Amino acid sequence: MNLHPTTRIRFFGVAAYEIVTRAGVRILMDPFLDENPGSPVRSDSFDKVDLVIVSHAAYDHLGDTEAIAKRYGCPVIAGGEVRAYLAAKGVPTTQVRATTWGIRVKVAGVEVQPVECHHWSQIKMPDGTFASGVPMAFVVYADDNVRFYHYGDTAIFSDMKLQAELYKPTIGCIGIANPQEILARNPMPGEMMTGEMSPYEGLLASQWLGLHTVLPCHYCQADDDDVRAFMRHHAAAKARGERTPDALVLNPGETIEVNTLGRIVSPKAA
């Protein structure tokens, strides 16, 4: 087998990511693509997909999982409510590995550790009823020294420190923004003041998780007030001498490369 020298991680906007391992395994996480105003990629843009991982049933995270599963025939890792929804939409149940916090699974040769996530997960089924389940964050064991934490829309909580001790994620995405392009699709009374984590909470979470590199996310455009606030908090923490992960703000469509030592080789982190 010819191995690529790096693990490649591409951001599509909001919380949608692609990991291509050194062996060429393509993993899509929370693949919200076709209706994502930031994504330059659509669900039919790939030559192959080897695995999809879904954190919860929100439309901007479940995204195009149904279309991708049907088009590429790839396995899906998700919670029970997502499995039930996909089955109702015609995806074979044998194609979906249901799991929850604590139950590590190995699919398509990739180990995935679901971890606690403080959020919700619900979806309207085709028959008009609603299904709810347990939202997940997860650690993807992509390659040696590349353990990717996907936050799954969680709020901050102190047991992130325990997750760091147990699973030792090296790089991860943390949601710190509240994109108006997405909120406008679901009007409600009043105003949503923050996302699941404020920029400061997101920085603190990245420290508690012990990440080497943090990728702030849940935005459609990198020129976002919350992203700028996150980077200000990051700079202030470094100036105070706190242990902080390197931080990278990615534009949708941008790719980073991680070497076999777990270090970012492209582009340069802050």
Please report, for each region that a protein language model flagged, where it lies by residue.
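Zn-dependent metallo-beta-lactamase
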Residues: M1-R26, L33-P37, V115-H118, L162, ...
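Active-site HxH/HxHxD metal-binding segment of metal-dependent hydrolases
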Residues: V41-R104, G109-M125
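Cap/insert and terminal regions of metallo-dependent hydrolase folds
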Residues: E81, A155-E254
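Short, surface-exposed amphipathic charged segments that create phosphate/polyanion-binding patches used
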Residues: A108-C117, D127-T129, N259-A270
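Active-site-proximal loop/helix segment associated with metal-binding centers of metalloenzymes
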Residues: P114-V146, T154-D159, Y167, I171, ...
